Amino acid sequence: MDRAELGAALRDYAYLEGDFVLRSGRRSRYYLDKYRFETVPELLGPLGELIAETVSEHEPDAVRLAGPELGAVALAAAASLSSGLPFLLVRKEAKEYGTANRLEGVFQTGERVCLVEDVVTSAGAAIEAVEALREAGLEVGTAVCVVDREEGGADALARAGVRLRALFRPTELLELSKSAAKPHG
């Protein structure tokens, strides 16, 4: 599946129109349902390959990937399988049992990590993940997301010293597919 076919399939599977409240609290007339594309092997595999290629091109010094729970874990795993780079799971908060870790996986202080994200709007969750990785002594300079909604997330990440590399943007997804968006509900 080439990039254009992947974008068209992504839109066909995950682009919904309606009235939605986003994680950021903003309202939107469209929604990209990440679980509709992260749970379909025909999309998850090619997305993992494209994320791996993007990491190789834009963050070649990365020795590890990191995916925030819950949404980006499947993407980080797919990119890990494609790239051969191990990955970390970034919890929203440290668990209160077992090892009490916020980061799951093995790593060494000072390693360069590339953050993998699903859909970026304001980048609030991505910045929280970057902060957790940095607090653990890891270096983060790049984040790769499937879709940048172009609503300030790239600028917010830049202020945190992280470059955002998006595989797709909403306007591009709309141009790649001729089929009608699925109504929500």
Language model features by range: what are they?
Residues 1-116, 120-185:
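PRPP-associated nucleotide enzymes
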